[in-house]
């Protein structure tokens, strides 16, 4: 297969993994687009994206326009004369004139099995909803949000032990493999594009810190899914004794209870069992303010009086 001249557009670590795969391939990455440097850390020092750092380390020209809607930026991109543009978690909207510029157009690697979970947080929403599988879709980009024709799909079972962090790692490995397969198919003309079924489409909205508050009026099953979805960010939590307590790991208990939602049923080194609207949730790993995450046994040693049976955990901030 003849090497393709590729423009790569991406910003976070997930995107950098895909850029590295292209750099390891026989294709030519002729330019990299990434978001402008942002203030980060306590000193708010301007910090380059992981994609920029990788591009600079490999002596690839880097472009960081604040927008691709203006003609000078579009002309600069067109001057690269790329065969194709690969977009992975870039963060800027690509207008139609940009999508039409490369000979083979623009393709995107998305962390879900489209058309399910279009949008910003597909990995987290798959866990949040209790999906049994997820995967990667490589699509031909159009002007919509993740609405383009699908070129290649891979699937991955979601395990009970998975969190957003672990799924992210799995998809960050699966995505680059799918990307290289799709590029080969595009170059050879062997890929058959598949339209997305709009009837099956839904949107993966960004997570919020407010959404991470545990609502004991939900089912134990749903709360278990949410704790996994919100790990490592924004991390599920509840308010108790005037403190915000983060919850990193739970499981659905086989215990049954008629107690009011939010009531502690039992507390032992095996876990703190809390009644919900449907079922009992066992808290296994938590984080007290200013402390590291700890197993419940250690939490009870430090603050056992907070978690006595029949204590009611608040649904709202106290």
From Swiss-Prot:
User: Which keywords describe this protein according to UniProt?
Assistant: Protein biosynthesis, Transferase
Give the EC number.
2.1.2.9
Q: What organism does the UniProt record list as the source?
A: Shewanella baltica (strain OS155 / ATCC BAA-1091)
Q: What's one Pfam family the UniProt record gives for this protein?
A: Formyl_trans_N
**Where is (6S)-5,6,7,8-tetrahydrofolate annotated to bind?**
112-115
CDD domains, per this entry?
Answer: FMT_core_Met-tRNA-FMT_N, Met_tRNA_FMT_C
Q: According to its UniProt record, which reaction does this protein catalyse?
A: L-methionyl-tRNA(fMet) + (6R)-10-formyltetrahydrofolate = N-formyl-L-methionyl-tRNA(fMet) + (6S)-5,6,7,8-tetrahydrofolate + H(+)
Record's function text: Attaches a formyl group to the free amino group of methionyl-tRNA(fMet). The formyl group appears to play a dual role in the initiator identity of N-formylmethionyl-tRNA by promoting its recognition by IF2 and preventing the misappropriation of this tRNA by the elongation apparatus.
Q: Which InterPro entries match?
A: Fmt, Formyl_trans_C, Formyl_trans_C_sf, Formyl_transf_N, Formyl_transf_N_sf, Formyl_transferase-like_C_sf, GART_AS, Met-tRNA-FMT_C
- What protein name is recorded for this chain? Methionyl-tRNA formyltransferase
- What family is it from? Belongs to the Fmt family.
Tell me yes or no: is Transferase among this UniProt entry's keywords: yes
Q: Could you give one GO CC term from the UniProt record?
A: cytosol
> What terms describe the molecular function in GO for this protein?
methionyl-tRNA formyltransferase activity
UniProt superkingdom: Bacteria
Identify the PROSITE patterns for this entry: GART (PS00373)
């Amino acid at each position: 297969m003849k090497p393709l001249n590729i423009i790569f557009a991406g910003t976070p670590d997930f995107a950098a993994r895909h850029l590295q795969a292209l750099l390891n391939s026989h294709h030519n990455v002729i330019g990299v687009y990434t978001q402008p440097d942002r203030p980060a850390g306590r000193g708010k020092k301007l910090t380059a994206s992981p994609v920029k750092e990788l591009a600079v380390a490999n002596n690839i020209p880097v472009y960081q326009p604040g927008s691709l809607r203006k003609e000078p930026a579009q002309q600069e991109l067109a001057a690269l004369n790329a065969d194709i543009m690969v977009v992975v978690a870039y963060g800027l909207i690509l207008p139609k004139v940009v999508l039409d510029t490369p000979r083979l157009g623009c393709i995107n690697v998305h962390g879900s099995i489209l058309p399910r979970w279009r949008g910003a947080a597909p990995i987290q929403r798959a866990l949040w909803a209790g999906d049994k599988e997820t995967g990667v879709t490589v699509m031909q980009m159009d002007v919509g949000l993740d609405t383009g024709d699908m070129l290649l799909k891979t699937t991955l079972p979601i395990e009970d032990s998975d969190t957003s962090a672990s799924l992210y790692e799995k998809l960050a490995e699966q995505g680059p493999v799918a990307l290289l397969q799709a590029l080969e198919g595009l170059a050879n003309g062997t890929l058959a594009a598949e339209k997305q079924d709009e009837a099956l489409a839904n949107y993966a909205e960004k997570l919020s810190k407010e959404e991470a508050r545990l609502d004991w009026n939900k089912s134990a099953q749903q709360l278990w899914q949410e704790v996994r979805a919100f790990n490592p960010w924004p991390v599920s939590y509840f308010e108790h004794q005037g403190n915000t307590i983060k919850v990193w790991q739970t499981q659905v208990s086989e215990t049954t209870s008629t107690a009011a939602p939010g009531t502690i049923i039992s507390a032992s080194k095996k876990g703190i069992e809390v009644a919900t609207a449907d079922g009992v949730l066992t808290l296994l790993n938590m984080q007290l303010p200013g402390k590291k995450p700890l197993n419940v046994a250690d939490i009870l040693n430090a603050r056992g009086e907070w978690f006595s049976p029949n204590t009611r955990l608040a649904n709202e901030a106290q």
